[in-house]
Amino acid sequence: MTTQDFLLEIGCEELPPRRLNQLSQALSQTIKSELEKADLSFENIHRYATPRRLAVLVNNLALQQPQRKIERQGPSVKAAFDKDQTPTLACFGFAQSCGVSTAQLKVKKTKKGEFIYCEIEQPGQNTLDLLPNIIQSALKQLPTPKAMRWGDHKEFFVRPVHWIILMLGKDLVPATLLGKMASCETRGHRFHHPKNILVTKPDDYQKLLLTHGMVIADFEKRREKIRDLIQKAASEKGEAIIDEGLLEEVTGMVEWPVILVGNFKAEFLELPPEVLITTMKVHQRTFPIKNKNGDLLPYFIIVSNIESKNPKRVIVGNERVINARLADASFFYDNDLRTSLENRLPKLGDVIFQRQLGTLADKARRIEKLAAFIAKQINIDEQLAARAGLLSKCDLVSEMVYEFPTLQGIMGYYYAFHDKEPPLVAEAIKEHYLPRFSGDQLPRNLLSACVAVADRIDTIIGIIGINKSPTGDKDPFALRRAALGILRILIEKELSLDLFALLNEAKNNYAVELPNVNVANQSFDFIIERLRAWYLEKEVPASVFMAVLASHPADPLDFDRRIKAVQHFQTLPEADALAAANKRVSNILKKQAAELKSKTIDHSLFDSDAEHLLADQLKERAELVNNLYKKADYTKALSELASLKEPIDIFFDKVMVMVDDKEKRENRLALLSSLQQLFSQIADISLLS
């Protein structure tokens, strides 16, 4: 048999549940990479992960590397042979070291001259001998920033290791990993089956743990099992609210999921639903239940890791904790309602936003001004925008947000309603944090969008203004995410705003002069770079982006309209020829820039029908295209310009631009310049060629 299954299991103390799936994926990927590097073929890889183990099963792993032919370089030809082409001592010595005769040596030309070399057949090594080093190398590559050491071991790992399985087929791979000798024994559930379980062959691993150890080893299967059990248990009361992040975490906490249903005091339903959900999620990792109308019910789902002989006791324990936590939340909420958002403004002055940029109170006042400025540009109520901007950060100093930071904005929404602030202001306080991540929903109304953009613009200007732009993968102030949020809001909400004007306004709102005098330009370039990355993710060709960028639009919505117009233009049959013609025009004009003294076209200097035809078509199309340009109907404008293909082709076929007659030459250059300007006001089509 030339292949066997290979099994690795690392048994340890409970792994971090939020990182378990990521660790499992990383281990599988690094082992795959190392096997490929060693030129060991295999069919596929399965990964397993539970709180107490990380495992990888490799199916049909080759038992030996393939035989390889390697080249070994020797001395130069000059050193290897004398004038009579007789092998020298150096040549004999090299041949002897390779185990061949001098007649079997070959000559190869390189950049450094001619050298002799020998082809050696290298037999492949046994997989059994290679595996220990392969696994060691894979483990070193695991993303474990908080690895720990235990006992008197020198080895580091995420958690202390208690056992290791290394099996190739039915054979043990003799090795010591992470301070433990490899064996063929795994362990079952910590409480239900703590004894060792003998694994006779790798393919039995998952089944043995399930039937003997009460462990569902496959992370994905366990997660879907938990989902199904939660939904089934909740269906008796209503419908479970399943947070995918919490489901992932709970899957990383249990090996044998058991579902129980508990309840809390109905009086707590008077609290905002987000408070109830967050309390249950953060403190007890439980799932809420709602009715058909979406209202919360006084029940929750517990995912336990044991089949208790007295499940009621487990439920009562969880209920006691949940009720106590909800009582705390109710206390925080009632306390917070005693102080209005506006009266919290002075307390924001005690919270530093950034040492060089002042406090959160300073930031709130800057957002107030910038939100009003944006509101004026898009013709909505400036006073409401200013009010929402001023109060946008006030809930950050509330007791509830201090306890649950993820409720920022949400609590501000409820407190604003309690303070009888306008509904739009309350919504803006909640929604100005949107979008929180890639693909997240956007603010629903324009007032919220104003505050959201103002907040992000202020942050970008401030941080870049003190020369702390993101570098590499370091972005502590999440400026890249802020830039993408601005772009998505402006483009998807169809808000036409001059980005450069916004940045300058934000810069002027800072009470102190920012150290970076070029902050507005650098911030603009930073945001446009995020726009480029966004389009690349949407598979917009880089050439299309560069073509539009060449026209320097400062309005992201306008930029997007041009992108779509150029993409449509590329579908036209005339597109390639026009792009090539524009490139030709661009090259001619670059070389003859000094001769472009006059932009006026003199028809009396034409001496061919081709010149008249192109000039007449340009004049006819220019008026129509310029009107479409003013309406920002770029798609139709470029479609109209496509009709110039024929007169442009005829012009280049019949007319010599660089003639000796200076007047005619300059006149023809002026004609080409007019053609270029007509196209380039939308995008530089020549860059598509």
UniProtKB/Swiss-Prot annotation:
Its EC number is 6.1.1.14. It catalyses: tRNA(Gly) + glycine + ATP = glycyl-tRNA(Gly) + AMP + diphosphate. GO terms for cellular component: cytosol. Keywords: Aminoacyl-tRNA synthetase, ATP-binding, Cytoplasm, Ligase, Nucleotide-binding, Protein biosynthesis. One of its GO terms (biological process) is glycyl-tRNA aminoacylation. One of its GO terms (molecular function) is arginine-tRNA ligase activity. Tetramer of two alpha and two beta subunits. Belongs to the class-II aminoacyl-tRNA synthetase family. This is Glycine--tRNA ligase beta subunit. It comes from Coxiella burnetii (strain Dugway 5J108-111).
